[in-house]
Amino acid sequence: YIEYITAPNDPDYEIGFRAYGYWGFQRSLAAQLDQNTMYSVRPGTEVIPYFMPAGVRRGNNRGPKNISYPHIFPGEDLEAFNFFEASSIRKIGNKYVTIYSGHSGPDYGLGSSNSTLRYAYGDSPLGPWKSGGVLVDSRAPVLNQDGSRLQTTNAGHNTHGSIELINGQWYVFYHRPPRGFGNARQSMVAPIHVEWDKKPVSEGGKVSIRAYDPYAKDNIWTAKDSQGNEYKGAEVTSEGFHIFGLDPYQYYSAGFACYLSDGRIQQDSWDIWDNHAPITNVKNGNIIGYKYFGFGGLNKDKLGLKAFEGTKKGNKTAFNLFLAPKTSKTFKVNVWLDGPWNNETWKGTKIGEIVVPANSAQETTQFTIDVSKFVDHLDKKHAIYLVAESQETGDLFDLAGLGFSSNKKKIVRPVVPKVNIEVNGKAIEVPETPVRSTESNGITGYDIYEAVYKLPAGTTGIPTVSASATDKSVKVEIIQATSVS
């Protein structure tokens, strides 16, 4: 972190800044850096060996027994910090905030996980710090069916990130792991409400970070169960920067889903040209949710977002689901608005059902139902939930995506072109995944695919390579071989 110096009486005024480094895995360390090297410890200072308390869960501090933490405010609960790794420092008003990957969950009634960001605040880049609590839990905590407890609705592994003010709105950036796979990290962003006062932390000043909802009371979203457990971190949604809701009249892949009753069904994709991450092997009772669709539209450009038209009477809005059946039996997908249950906790409304006939082709197919009665008068933003229903116990379908259409706006599922490569007129296998990065190949992107063709023994003629694509707009360039060696 760079602390810029503007006070003439500061000893570093002539240099203009102070630099700090923060590091550590399951142990927090920090140091002031030499401004001349920007990597070594500043002369006259030392590495802080135990900067913030690290832990797995409350009551399990990883630090040595009887260690002191001079960079934590006296009286703070050392077990509330739970540092894991990945510090990021921001200045907010007259205070400093450190964001880090930490263990959370028991503080709001869930199991402990480092799939969360936490924060602390202080008067300097080196504290001393007071714990602010959880910033975001990528496991997507929400109420269970009857509101008696909180539950997770996404898989967990770990997360890293920070916060930033953009166009007057604060956001938290983090990542979540499809099906809990730590090497598949889906980038996420959510709006937050940041509040601070002018008092120094040493005199009782605070920084508070809560989930932001432009349509909620006081613009604050929260999830609190009937036992009093409350998750105050950012809400995990499908929106990204579109905090007034997604434009309903577009296609959204299964990768946008943010509520999964079974976190194992979310897959990932190596294809950088395909904004697609399928949900597979959906079974009876599985719930898939998207939060939120901006049925009320956005009447003018705001916060860097372009205005869009929502639903309205006369649109004859239809709901479109793109799925591939995996059974020869019939099954249903129930479509719910606001919640997957019609009870006091969720207040959901079933707006239709998609019936997939027996013996349907096991390929991605578009199914459409009229939902205009339920959505063409809505304002603000609302969630959509899919609930699978069948007498079968096995896999029912794979979900590709969904979206709404109207009598004026059609929906088209984007399909990435398929490339066919032939050698001497014989098709060869094109791999589904790109070349992986290794220490020897130096490849850092995911845009190179390698297909191999082994010449038959005794081949003397130079082979001819041809290629084509299902989309004529794909440009094909071939450099033919000049020899067989």
Question: Residue spans of the language-model regions?
Answer:
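Carbohydrate-active catalytic/glycan-binding domains of CAZyme proteins
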Residues: 1-355, 359-411
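Beta-rich interaction/scaffold domains
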Residues: 409-485
